[in-house]
Amino acid sequence: CQAIPFVFEQPCNTMDEIATLKGRLTHPVYLDESTEDQNAVLRAISLGIADGFGFKVTRLGGLTRMTTVRDLCAIRSLPHSCDDAWGGDVIAAACVHLAATVEPRRMEGAWIAQEY
C-alpha cells in the first residue's frame, strides 16, 4: 500500500539482487549491509538502486570515509543515517556529531548507544 510510509532496508543480500527487485517496489529502498566502502556506495548510486542509506561509521572505515559518503549523498540529494552496529560513548558522540553536519531534510537519524 503506497499510502503507508515504509522503507525497505537492505531487502536482499547483494546489490545485484536488489537491482532485480527494485523496479517492482513502490516504496523506497535503503542500503545498509552492502555498502561497506565508498566504492560500494558509488556503485549503488550509479545503478540507481538506493533511495537512501543506513551508514555505519565503523563499517565504512571511520569518520573520514563517512564524511566522503555523506558528501556523495549531498551531491545526489540522498537521505541517510549516521549509525553504527554497537559501541560506547565515543562512537555515539561520533555519530551524533557527524549527523549534525548533514542537511536536516536528508538526515534519517543518528545512533546513540544504550545499554540493554
Task: State where each predicted segment sits.
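Alpha/beta enzyme core
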Residues: 1-7
